[in-house]
Design a protein with these regions (language model features):
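Active-site C-terminal subdomain of aminotransferase-like
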Residues: 251-254, 258-370, 376-381
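Structured alpha-helical segments in the cores of large, soluble enzyme domains
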Residues: 95-103, 160-164, 188-196, 314-321, ...
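Non-catalytic terminal extensions of PLP-dependent enzymes
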Residues: 1-111, 132, 138, 142, ...
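Short, glycine-/Ser/Thr-/acidic-enriched flexible segments
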Residues: 159-161, 182-183, 208-210, 245, ...
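Conserved PLP-enzyme active-site core in the AAT-like
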Residues: 2, 7-14, 118-299, 304-307
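Secondary-structure capping and boundary motifs in well-ordered enzyme cores
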Residues: 90, 119-126, 156, 160, ...
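A short glycine/serine-rich beta->alpha loop
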Residues: 26, 59, 82-87, 113-122, ...
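A generic structural motif
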Residues: 177-183, 231-241, 297-300, 312, ...
Length: 478
């Protein structure tokens, strides 16, 4: 009888009249029998309905809009594995062209036909590759000098993205962190150098700090390192984590020196699926010259029909994102990227100004140097408020927006902030809708007679340990 019902569901029964739609979706075991594609599609699609719509997700840095031609091109390549270079040699060529384009955007001095770089599944893998290269170069030099090489370290601000903590744990490399303060909101070069020694593999400035949106001053760090290395005899290099800024600075601030124009910058990592304007996941890392990419990082296999050499932590990876990146470079060109990033920046600055005018709030920084920023409650308002920024996050989510609230990293953990990332697809009109929803929520909060549960919990936590109440599920994610 069930077979008859299944045939009817497939041929003539409406999807929501089918037996499958009366049953729960599988959660632990694979179903015994096949399901028609129409019903399977609907069941999976229904699972996504309660979620925030991607373009309203202002927590993420990830691209949520590409044009129809880009989407079509990527869909047509969904079955292509990048690593199969023998079968798909043109994909590898396009990846190499993308590396060349980015290397030249970042003023690479390398004269080779193909610049030294690697594809990654995201900026996290790209950071790992840049860090590993610095570690292997340092280790090789220490071995050659007959010196110990068992205690490597690197220096970064407390505004680091979690990948650097993973890097430290996985490769057992000490991470030395330079604290941020309200007065010093980016990496302090002198403090960074005070943490360096003969075991320092690199210093990592960040262009587009995940927590704040600000840029570390790479040029100032480079000048300081020039003097430091000359005095000590060390040759500590810089790896720039430009997950966001790598696709912003070349187009909006081309004269700013943060890249390979600086002596000690030997590698740069970025994300193609953030402001590179490609759907996830895609990252890139470029070295100043092939000599800075250790041979130990290249691995070869011969079981795919030819001898294939690659640099990366992952092996198989989708080719669609490579086609998407190459398409964007061709489709948009320099001026197209500049126009899109300029629009995002202009809208971010507009929102920054409007939120700064709202009675409860104060912006973390007067500057908007990337298309994102953070703000917090004014201390005098916070002392008597019956609500918190976590409540505002929840209220906005009821209207479809995702605007995260979170605590800042160590040394600033008493500050709960909110952040908006302005990406391609976030228009001025949508921004006005968001600002209206924010103001409406604040108006309702100010009518409260009693504090919210989050406010009670936060105040209690402050009295007990002197820290703000933290929603552990809210992250500043990348």
């Amino acid at each position: 009888m069930s077979n008859v019902n299944e045939q009817r569901a497939t041929i003539e029964t409406p999807i929501f009249g089918s037996e499958k739609m009366r049953n729960s979706a599988p959660t632990e075991t694979i179903p015994m029998h096949p399901t028609s594609p129409e019903i399977a599609y609907q069941m999976v699609k229904d699972e996504t309905f309660p979620q925030t719509q991607p373009r309203l997700n202002l927590a993420t840095f990830v691209t949520t809009y590409m044009d129809d031609y880009a989407t079509k091109l990527m869909n047509e390549a969904i079955d292509i594995n990048y690593i199969d270079e023998t079968e798909y040699p043109r994909v590898a060529v396009m990846a190499a062209r993308c590396i060349n384009i980015m290397a030249n955007l970042w003023h690479s001095p390398e004269q080779a036909k193909w610049k030294a770089g690697a594809l990654a599944i995201g900026s996290s893998e790209a950071c790992m590759l840049g860090g590993v290269a610095a570690w292997l170069r340092w280790r090789a030099k220490r071995k050659a000098q007959g010196k110990p090489y068992d205690k490597p370290n690197f220096v970064i601000s407390t505004g680091f993205q979690v990948v650097w903590e993973k890097f430290a744990q996985l490769w057992q490399i000490e991470m030395r962190t330079v604290p941020l303060t309200l007065e010093k909101t980016t990496l302090d070069p002198q403090l960074a150098l005070s943490m360096c020694d003969e075991n320092t593999i690199c210093v990592v400035p960040i262009e587009g700090v995940t927590w704040t949106g600000l840029n570390d001053d790479v040029e100032a760090l480079d000048r300081a390192l020039e003097d430091y290395n000359a005095r000590t005899g060390y040759d500590i290099p810089i790896h720039v984590d430009a997950a966001s800024g790598g696709y912003i600075l070349p187009f909006l601030d081309p004269d700013k020196k943060w890249d390979f124009r600086l002596k000690w910058v030997l590698s740069i990592s970025t994300s193609g699926h953030k402001f590179g304007l490609v759907y996830p996941g895609l990252g890139w890392v470029v070295w100043k010259d092939k000599k800075y990419l250790p041979d130990e990082m290249s691995f070869s296999v011969n079981y795919l029909g030819a001898n294939i050499t690659q640099v990366g932590l992952n092996f198989s990876r989708p080719a669609a994102q490579i086609l998407g990146q190459y398409y964007q470079f061709i489709r948009l060109g320099f001026e197209g990227y500049k126009e899109i990033q300029s629009n995002s920046m202009d809208i971010a600055r507009y929102a920054h100004e409007q939120i700064g005018k709202m009675a409860p709030f104060e912006n973390y920084s007067d500057d908007v140097v990337n298309p994102l920023f953070i703000w917090y409650m004014k201390p005098e308002y916070d002392r008597t408020a019956k609500w918190t920024l976590y409540d505002l996050q929840a209220a906005l989510q009821q209207n479809g927006w995702m605007v995260p609230a979170y605590t800042l990293p160590n040394n600033l953990q008493n500050y709960v902030v909110m952040r908006i990332v302005f990406r391609q697809g976030m228009s001025r009109d949508m921004t006005d809708m968001l600002l209206t929803d924010m103001q409406n929520a604040i108006t309702e909060f100010e009518k409260l007679e009693y504090p919210t549960q989050t406010r009670v919990a936060q105040n209690k936590q402050q009295r007990v340990v002197g820290k703000v109440f933290t929603h552990t599920h809210v992250k500043a994610g990348r």
